[in-house]
Amino acid sequence: MTPFDTSLVPNGDILIGGEWRRGRGAPYTSIYPADQSLNLEVSTANADDAADAVVAADAAWRRADWAGLKPHQRALVLYRIAELIMQRHEALANLQRRDNGKPIGETRVLVASAANTFRYFAACLETLDEELTPSRGDYLTMSVHEPIGVIAAITPWNSPIASDAQKLAPALAGGNAVVLKPAEVTPLVSLALARICEEAGVPKGVLSVLPGKGSVIGDVLVRHPLVKKVSFTGGTEVGRGIARIAAEKLMPVSLELGGKSPTIVCDDADLDHAVNGVLYGIFSSSGEACIAGSRLFVQRAVYDEFMQRLVAGARKLRVGDPTRPDTQMGPLISAKHRESVERYVALGLEEGGRLLCGGERPSGDGRERGFFYQPTILEGLPNSARICQEEIFGPVLVAMPFDDEASLLAQANDSVFGLAAGIWTRDYKRAWRIARALETGTVWINTYKLFSISTPFSGWKESGMGREKGRLGIREYMQQKSLYWGLNDAPLPWAN
């Protein structure tokens, strides 16, 4: 008997052009990162399957049974998707847990977040206005928005159901057809979500889900002439390659890429509150988050005291069984990824860093069978060190002291990334100055990793382009059109 509900992913079939069937790629064996036990074998797509899905999506988009619906009619389907997600909340949370090893407490939140995302964009459809622009003569002018067409949505393995929802909900709301490419190692919850979408009333062919190798399927999707937009969340180098191909096609892209986010603790901060926030900002999700606060800047006057409290807190974090509600850190996604994290820690030590805690695999309670790694904190490195400049995507924090705002900002902004940042201070004027000067798309003040679906999310610099969430998020999946209505029968000027 399988240790979780597989009713939403029966037989490991995948959705290609409205049909649940076996893909023509090599089967993928999904395992549980906490103990390497078998989840199930999933069919995968190959290049031909990807091309078939795109052609079917284009045909489905051109039909009137989705793009031709009135906005409130599409909204009803999105509301129904949200309802079905919540009806299957616990099954989906456990499926997500088995997929990537996140603790059940986190996956429950992610499932609820996915439902809220569909609900929010349904509400947007009910309330979005078009613009009646000021006239410059005897004519009426207005701006309207139309679907783009076929959207390729490529999502990561760290929070699949939330990432899928953040692309599917606005893309479907906009009247588009979507070919979803989930990460190779986490196909399960994406397939389950597709079944929910069909049950809710998304017409056949409007959504396909193609598990498999990104280098194969992703390449077909990005290059295919019928794909009119790519929305990608993942590594910066892959995103850069997508942008190059898109430039040749003159195709719009949304890219949510890497990060190396600074967290700043000022000398007037509530240190206990800041300790809790810094620990959560880097070690929740085992550090496998693009927004993880992986660079820590602490004002020198409180550096020693703060670091003492922080290290003590890190050592108390509960690392282990993802089924336990009190677990704070689960395993990393794979043995290969854990080895990458270990190489970065070794590099940090070679560069002169001092290990304050962690830096090893935990033992006991069966954790040897999984891909666990202890929360790790280093100090004694300059911001120019590789471990401070390159995204590790794991539970590794590097701490550095700072003396004044000028030196702080010079270091915090000295990064190719610009995704997020956190500030801990009681001084709202200081918070305002620093927040406005930071070169990032999101800044948290006296909190971290909190999100509102109604607030746009974006990266600066090499952390990406485009917007997710908020009303701007739905417009990312629509194209604007201007209409001019003549109001008199006077001849046009050249005919006079």
Question: Positions of the model-derived regions?
Answer:
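Conserved C-terminal structural/oligomerization subdomain of aldehyde/semialdehyde dehydrogenase
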Residues: 37-40, 227, 264, 318, ...
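Residue-level signal for inorganic ion chemistry
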Residues: 36-37, 74, 96, 118, ...
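Hydrophobic face of amphipathic alpha-helices that form TPR/SEL1-like repeat modules
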Residues: 1-35, 60
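Glycine-rich loop-to-alpha-helix module at the N-terminal edge of alpha/beta enzyme cores
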Residues: 37-128
